[in-house]
From Swiss-Prot:
The keyword rRNA-binding applies. One of its GO terms (biological process) is translation. The lineage of its organism: Bacteria, Bacillati, Chloroflexota, Chloroflexia, Herpetosiphonales. The keyword Magnesium does not apply. One of its GO terms (molecular function) is structural constituent of ribosome. This is Large ribosomal subunit protein uL22. This protein binds specifically to 23S rRNA; its binding is stimulated by other ribosomal proteins, e.g. L4, L17, and L20. It is important during the early stages of 50S assembly. It makes multiple contacts with different domains of the 23S rRNA in the assembled 50S subunit and ribosome. The globular domain of the protein is located near the polypeptide exit tunnel on the outside of the subunit, while an extended beta-hairpin is found that lines the wall of the exit tunnel in the center of the 70S ribosome. It comes from Herpetosiphon aurantiacus (strain ATCC 23779 / DSM 785 / 114-95).
Length: 113
């Protein structure tokens, strides 16, 4: 059985968030939260929040044991991009792209139906 949680429009580049997501993919939920607790990245607490939400969804909706859960899938997709301009010399302007991410976490207890 699987449970899912999604965080949308997280204001950080997907490229940077994927670096943290790759560290916890396939790990036990408690082990993944332990790893994220000590990472110095801005994305780590947000990914931990989504994993905790997926864990709570599994417990509440499907009565799955939280100790047996594994991070089966963690996807980081591109969200909307905010376009801003930075003034430059001689009246020019450069476009700045402020990227955002959608983080999807699927946890599984490994049980086959």
């Amino acid at each position: 059985m699987q449970a899912k949680a999604i965080l949308r429009n997280f204001r950080m580049s997907p490229q940077k968030v994927r670096l943290v997501a790759d560290l916890v993919r396939g790990k036990n939920v408690t082990e993944a939260l332990g790893i994220l607790q000590y990472l110095p990245h801005k994305a780590a607490p947000e990914i931990a929040r989504v994993i905790k939400s997926a864990k709570a969804n599994a417990d509440h909706n499907y009565q799955m044991s939280p100790e047996d859960l594994v991070v089966k899938t963690i996807m980081v997709d591109a969200g909307p991009v905010l376009k801003r301009y930075m003034p430059r010399a001689r009246g020019r302007g450069d476009r700045i792209l402020k990227r955002s991410s959608h983080i999807t976490v699927i946890v599984d207890d490994g049980e086959v139906l």
